[in-house]
């Protein structure tokens, strides 16, 4: 059913749940999984060869590897990318260019009201502009 799945990742518990679901669906469907993390938009003014941007990108990739290694458990049809960008618009752009079948997002729950989940501005923008279905995963 799905051949290309994109997880918008923010290093939060909600994003971790979204990643878990993305891995599960990619495994079940034999799909390729791409995880995207938007770096601070203000870094966009730097040249891509700027030492500061290279260092932040490498640190982010290492952090992802460290946090996700236990979840991936041998699943290797996965890529991770990060760059300075508007998180919502870049997620939709990646989905469009890659012909993504499904975008997966985490939604945050209010601790006192676990039956209520919320989606922030980035999530709402993705829901409005996505070129494919979007799946929301509660925390």
What is the meaning of each model-derived region?
Residues 1-17, 75, 79, 102, ...:
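Intrinsically disordered or low-complexity boundary/linker segments at protein termini
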Residues 3-49:
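Small/aliphatic-rich secondary-structure junction motif
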Residues 23, 69, 124:
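Active-site phosphate/pyrophosphate- and oxyanion-stabilizing loops and adjacent acidic/basic residues
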Residues 24-27, 93-96, 128:
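Solvent-exposed polar/charged
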Residues 52-63:
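A short acidic, glycine-rich active-site loop
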Residues 72-103:
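Structural beta-alpha unit
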Residues 96-139:
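Gly/Ser-rich helix-loop-strand patches that form or flank binding pockets
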